[in-house]
Amino acid sequence: MEESITLLTKIKEAFACEGQDVRAYSPLTLAYIGDGIYELVIRSVVVERANRSANDLHKKTTRYVKAPAQSAMIEAMLPELTEEEEAVYRRGRNAKSYTTAKNASVADYRRATGFEALMGYLYLTGQIDRMLQLIKDGIRLAGMEL
């Protein structure tokens, strides 16, 4: 069976990266990469839907990538997660972080960290279709419109 070509596959090839065991990453490492890939997805959709000024694009994107929005999304889609996905989310949510969000409650920030850890896990394990489906479902279930 052929491995699908993904952005991660191309990055690993271009920079001669060896595959790491994703289960060995800390939940905060998963959240770190998850934050970036989630923002890239949202930015891609926002740009694709409207050619606007950078300031307008930033304002639209920010509504979806801030901690309260991510918290609302993960809360709404928790029943949709598999046991494995929920375990990754819980690891991220319960991780001891030394940073806090400027405009979010501690609870929202922790749930957002769990959400980002899940996004990072799905990205690093090549489950891109599942990651995108959860993002779409989370936005819809949280009553947000992209």
Short names for language-model regions:
Residues 1-146:
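Double-stranded RNA-binding/processing signature
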